[in-house]
UniProtKB/Swiss-Prot annotation:
UniProt gene name: hscB
InterPro entries for this protein: DnaJ_domain, HscB, HscB_C_sf, HscB_oligo_C, J_dom_sf
Oligomer status and interactors: Interacts with HscA and stimulates its ATPase activity.
Domain J, chain residue ranges per copy: 5-77
PROSITE patterns: DNAJ_2
Keywords, comma-separated and alphabetical: Chaperone
Name assigned to this protein: Co-chaperone protein HscB homolog
Superkingdom of the source species: Bacteria
Length: 173
């Protein structure tokens, strides 16, 4: 069984802009249909296929619901697979990364929960701006380099957001 396009699994056209509530509802509907428990009395082959379909559906949902992963996937659909790790040749972005990490370290050192909350809001705004920028250029072949650069920035902000959530948990303890 080949892997169908993640978008096709959900009866969607490839697009960066998705209705996440609609995606979640469709996921729940499909998950019920392919859940391995529904095939408990079936033969071994059917059980294995149900497991594969369920795993494929779960992977597709995780990719489509996360903007940076959806961006990477869309770019891969339109061209060569992107390497997971790439040396970033963007000095402004590298400087921004260093500044954000330094700011987060200071917030951690100061155990500044209010500062962390403000930092998190700024990150969310930056992520929304990147999402808008990516949505405007991902399907334009003449702007592929820009789309790849934006996708890498999205991935960085995702990692940083994860670190912020971890810091919040540590400071809440």
């Amino acid at each position: 069984m080949g892997n169908p396009c993640h978008f096709a699994l959900f009866d969607l056209q490839p697009s960066f802009r998705l209705d996440l509530e609609q995606l979640a509802a469709r996921y729940r509907e499909l998950a019920r249909q392919v859940h391995p428990d529904r095939f408990a009395d079936a033969g071994e082959r059917e059980q294995r296929l149900a497991l594969e379909r369920s795993a494929c559906l779960n992977e597709a949902y995780q990719v489509l619901k996360t903007p940076s992963q959806r961006a990477r996937y869309l770019l891969a659909l339109r061209g060569p697979e992107l390497p997971l790790e790439v040396t970033v040749q963007d000095p402004d972005f590298l400087l921004q990364q260093m500044q954000l990490r330094e700011e987060l370290e200071e917030l951690q050192d100061d155990a500044d929960l209010a500062g962390v909350a403000a930092f998190k809001r700024r990150l969310k705004t930056a992520q929304e701006q990147l999402n808008d920028s990516f949505a405007a250029c991902w399907d334009d072949d003449t702007r592929r380099e820009e789309a790849e650069r934006l996708m890498r920035r999205m991935q960085f902000l995702d990692k940083l957001s994860h670190e912020v959530r971890q810091l919040e948990e540590r400071l809440d303890d």
